[in-house]
Amino acid sequence: MAKIVDIKGREVLDSRGNPTVEADVLLDNGIIGSACAPSGASTGSREALELRDGDKSRYLGKGVLKAVANINGPIRELLLGKDPSDQKALDRAMIELDGTENKAKLGANAILAVSLAAAKAAAQDQDLPLYAHIANLNGTPGQYSMPVPMMNIINGGEHADNNVDIQEFMVQPVGAKTFSDGLRMGTEIFHHLKAVLKARGLNTAVGDEGGFAPNLASNEDALGAIAEAVEKAGYKLGTDVTLALDCAASEFYEDGKYNLSGEGKSFDAEGFAEYLKGLTERFPIISIEDGLDESDWAGWKILTDKIGEKVQLVGDDLFVTNTKILKEGIEKGIGNSILIKFNQIGSLTETLEAIQMAKAAGYTAVISHRSGETEDSTIADLAVGTAAGQIKTGSLCRSDRVSKYNQLLRIEEQLGAKAVYRGRAEFRG
């Protein structure tokens, strides 16, 4: 049995030029596992705490030297000599050492980086691909699937400097036969969308997640541009390709109102649920994430009752990858899907528990990146190893996004005939 002989933390940069945490876990046989923690822009209020230094003289206060010191000090001392393959024991030990509800003492970014680095080291030690090791940890050995990519090709909200209120407009290649075919379809649509926007005299600069970020007349205008790009790429909207939204509604919710400032409109919960329902009737939108504010559970219930039978309603800020909150949502019939983000909860073990709870309740689980990413591609292995069926990892440019797609291509090649791609069957509704 291999043992952990050293743990090293360091400050590196994410895709927005902000510091984040990287950790190395070294084993007594020379194996090293490395992982980085991502960072979000639109964040749920109940997410685990990302520990920042607050020193305005360094990185505008966003340095992570405190989190790095926690890795190189107490976390290292805690885990030296431990078995890297006992993921649950490692994660529980770090959580207990932290001792807070939201990992505020050590930092979720510190705990997560070590948690993922240990998993990578353990996978190498067992001569397993990371996705296979994750499947074993998940209690589903050998059960894999290739996820349907939800490709964010128009960025708005907190992910772009434009007038579009809805944060993400995504395409899903549900009619593809394989993941690689689906990726090709999405890429072709992305390039056709650039031409569509250029023909309209619109900006084709990209946002945080690699999608285009033009000023548009309305959210519906964004959907119309994508529909045109799908057609020009030679695909049938609603059959080959479907659409998805991430409203990130908490970002434009204030005093009980949903304010679409880009359109000059304001709604109460009932009205905004009706607005979203209208969009699903005019476009083949099969998934809506954070359609209402994270605290507006009454509004979420209205939305779920209105369109939950035919549309996947994903809780991101709503559930923050937290089993306690998810359990309450399941009991109250709120939404029908959970977005899974490692750093919202802060460890691999707790992430797997959230996926398991969702699946047991008939909810889908969508594996997701953050807007502040690195070259770390662990979420690709997580999606395959848990057979989650769906992944959100941005658009078709920027290496911080493409690194995940490229890892999925490698995994598909490794799995061969076992690389099942289920397309539309992965979605609720």
UniProtKB/Swiss-Prot annotation:
<dbReference type="GO" id="GO:0000015">
    <property type="term" value="C:phosphopyruvate hydratase complex"/>
</dbReference>
<dbReference type="InterPro" id="IPR020810">
    <property type="entry name" value="Enolase_C"/>
</dbReference>
<comment type="pathway">
    <text>Carbohydrate degradation; glycolysis; pyruvate from D-glyceraldehyde 3-phosphate: step 4/5.</text>
</comment>
<keyword id="KW-0460">Magnesium</keyword>
<dbReference type="GO" id="GO:0000287">
    <property type="term" value="F:magnesium ion binding"/>
</dbReference>
<feature type="binding site">
    <location>
        <position position="341"/>
    </location>
    <ligand>
        <name>(2R)-2-phosphoglycerate</name>
    </ligand>
</feature>
<comment type="function">
    <text>Catalyzes the reversible conversion of 2-phosphoglycerate (2-PG) into phosphoenolpyruvate (PEP). It is essential for the degradation of carbohydrates via glycolysis.</text>
</comment>
<keyword id="KW-0456">Lyase</keyword>
<feature type="binding site">
    <location>
        <position position="371"/>
    </location>
    <ligand>
        <name>(2R)-2-phosphoglycerate</name>
    </ligand>
</feature>
<dbReference type="InterPro" id="IPR020811">
    <property type="entry name" value="Enolase_N"/>
</dbReference>
<feature type="binding site">
    <location>
        <position position="316"/>
    </location>
    <ligand>
        <name>Mg(2+)</name>
    </ligand>
</feature>
<dbReference type="Pfam" id="PF00113">
    <property type="entry name" value="Enolase_C"/>
</dbReference>
<keyword id="KW-0963">Cytoplasm</keyword>
<feature type="binding site">
    <location>
        <position position="246"/>
    </location>
    <ligand>
        <name>Mg(2+)</name>
    </ligand>
</feature>
<keyword id="KW-0964">Secreted</keyword>
<keyword id="KW-0479">Metal-binding</keyword>
<dbReference type="Pfam" id="PF03952">
    <property type="entry name" value="Enolase_N"/>
</dbReference>
<dbReference type="InterPro" id="IPR036849">
    <property type="entry name" value="Enolase-like_C_sf"/>
</dbReference>
<dbReference type="GO" id="GO:0005576">
    <property type="term" value="C:extracellular region"/>
</dbReference>
<feature type="active site" description="Proton acceptor">
    <location>
        <position position="341"/>
    </location>
</feature>
<feature type="binding site">
    <location>
        <position position="370"/>
    </location>
    <ligand>
        <name>(2R)-2-phosphoglycerate</name>
    </ligand>
</feature>
<dbReference type="GO" id="GO:0004634">
    <property type="term" value="F:phosphopyruvate hydratase activity"/>
</dbReference>
<protein>
    <recommendedName>
        <fullName>Enolase</fullName>
        <ecNumber>4.2.1.11</ecNumber>
    </recommendedName>
</protein>
<dbReference type="InterPro" id="IPR029017">
    <property type="entry name" value="Enolase-like_N"/>
</dbReference>
<feature type="binding site">
    <location>
        <position position="167"/>
    </location>
    <ligand>
        <name>(2R)-2-phosphoglycerate</name>
    </ligand>
</feature>
<keyword id="KW-0324">Glycolysis</keyword>
<feature type="active site" description="Proton donor">
    <location>
        <position position="209"/>
    </location>
</feature>
<feature type="binding site">
    <location>
        <position position="392"/>
    </location>
    <ligand>
        <name>(2R)-2-phosphoglycerate</name>
    </ligand>
</feature>
<dbReference type="GO" id="GO:0006096">
    <property type="term" value="P:glycolytic process"/>
</dbReference>
<dbReference type="GO" id="GO:0009986">
    <property type="term" value="C:cell surface"/>
</dbReference>
<dbReference type="InterPro" id="IPR020809">
    <property type="entry name" value="Enolase_CS"/>
</dbReference>
<comment type="subunit">
    <text>Component of the RNA degradosome, a multiprotein complex involved in RNA processing and mRNA degradation.</text>
</comment>
<dbReference type="InterPro" id="IPR000941">
    <property type="entry name" value="Enolase"/>
</dbReference>
<feature type="binding site">
    <location>
        <position position="289"/>
    </location>
    <ligand>
        <name>Mg(2+)</name>
    </ligand>
</feature>
<comment type="similarity">
    <text>Belongs to the enolase family.</text>
</comment>
